Amino acid sequence: MTPSISWCLLLLAGLCCLVPSFLAEDVQETDTSQKDQSPASHEIATNLGDFAISLYRELVHQSNTSNIFFSPVSIATAFAMLSLGSKGDTHTQILEGLQFNLTQTSEADIHNSFQHLLQTLNRPDSELQLSTGNGLFVNNDLKLVEKFLEEAKNHYQAEVFSVNFAESEEAKKVINDFVEKGTQGKIVEAVKKLEQDTVFVLANYILFKGKWKKPFDPENTKQAEFHVDESTTVKVPMMTLSGMLDVHHCSTLSSWVLLMDYAGNATAVFLLPDDGKMQHLEQTLNKELISKFLLNRRRRLAQIHIPRLSISGNYNLETLMSPLGITRIFNSGADLSGITEENAPLKLSQAVHKAVLTIDETGTEAAAATVLQGGFLSMPPILHFNRPFLFIIFEEHSQSPLFVGKVVDPTHK
C-alpha cells in the first residue's frame, strides 16, 4: 500500500525599509578595500548574481506590466536548506536551479558558503539593520532526521518549533508570529491557509533597514509626474538630491546607472533605461556589469529626482522556480526522505515569497545641506526617475544581492 503524502510548506518573507539619515553626509569615497573577498563569499555572490537575474527575467516573462520586488537571498537560502533533506533528482534540481555547477562545486562548499553569508548578514552593525532568520515548524508527532536537523542549525542558523498542525489556526499563529517578529511587524499574516495534511513548514525572513549616507531633504520633495507607459501618467511625491553623486551612463545597457550608499555596508544600484530601452536593459544586464559598477566607483556633480514609494511582491514559487528546472520537489515524485524518519513521503505543497520595500522620508529633523556650491565646468546630468526603472540592493562585504526590484507604477503597493 502506498503511504500517504504529507504536505510541506515553504514560506519566505522579505522586508526592506530605506530611510534617509538626517545626519551630516559623508563625502568620502567608498572604501572597497574592506570588502570580504574570501572564497566562500565570492562563490555565493557569483551564484546569487546569476540566480537573481534568472529569477528576475522569469518574473518579467510572467508579467512585464507590474512592479517586481523579491529577495534572491531569502529564496536561495530556503531552497538550499531544503536541499539538505532532499535526495536524487530532487536534490540535483534544487542546487542546479540555484545556478550551482555540481561538477565544479561540492555540496559541502555550497552549504559552507551559505553559512558564511548568513554570518556576514547577521553581523552587528550600528548603522545598518540587517538580519535573517530560518524557522522549522514540525508537527509534534514528527521526528526529524538528526543529520538534517544538525546541519540546518549549523549552516542556516535554523530555529526549530514543535507545533500541532491539527490545530491549524494555532499553527498559523505560531508561524505568522515568527515572521511578524522577525520583520518587526511589517509582514503580517504571511500564512493565510495551511493544507489539511501539512506536517512541516520552513519559513525564512530577511529584514533590512538602511539610512542613506547622502540624505534627501523632505522639503525638496514635490509632486511630479511618473510615466507608467506611453498612455498612463500618475502623480507621485518626487524626492530630489543634488551633489557629488556616483552616476554615469552605460552605453552597453543604454541606461543611466546610479549608486547610492547606505550608512553601513550596503549599496543600492538604480538603473534608468533610455526611452524605449527597458527590454534591452533586461536582456543585457548581467552580474559582470553589476560587479564593475560596484568596484569602479566614480562621482560627479549631478542631480537626481526619484519617487518616494512603497511596493511589495507576493509570489507562488512553484510557477516561478519550475522554469528554472526546480520541478520534482512540487510533485508526488519528490524525495525529501532526508528530512523526517517517517515512512510517509513529504511533498512541497506551497512555496510562498513575500517582500516589502519602503523608500520614504519620515522624520522632521533638518537634513544636512546638499545644495551645490560653486559653478560647473560643464552641465551636470539631471536624472529624472519618472519612468519605469530597476534597482538592486547589495550587501557590500559579500557583494550579494539582497533585493531586486522593478518600479513600473510607484502608486501601486
Curated annotation (Swiss-Prot):
Pfam families from the UniProt entry: Serpin (PF00079)
Glycan attachment positions: N64, N101, N265
RCL: annotated segments: 368-387
Location relative to the cell: Secreted
Origin: domain of life: Eukaryota
Annotated site, Reactive bond, chain positions: L377, S378
GO cellular component: extracellular space
Keywords: Glycoprotein, Protease inhibitor, Secreted, Serine protease inhibitor, Signal
Residues making up the signal peptide according to the UniProt record: 1-24
Main location as per UniProt: secreted
Protein's GO biological process: response to cytokine; response to peptide hormone
Homology family: Belongs to the serpin family.
UniProt free text on domains: The reactive center loop (RCL) extends out from the body of the protein and directs binding to the target protease. The protease cleaves the serpin at the reactive site within the RCL, establishing a covalent linkage between the serpin reactive site and the active site of the protease. The resulting inactive serpin-protease complex is highly stable. Variability within the reactive center loop (RCL) sequences of Serpina1-related genes may determine target protease specificity.
Miscellaneous comment text of the record: Murine alpha-1-antitrypsin is represented by a cluster of up to 6 individual Serpina1-related genes. The precise complement of Serpina1-related genes present varies according to the strain of the animal.
Entry protein name: Alpha-1-antitrypsin 1-5
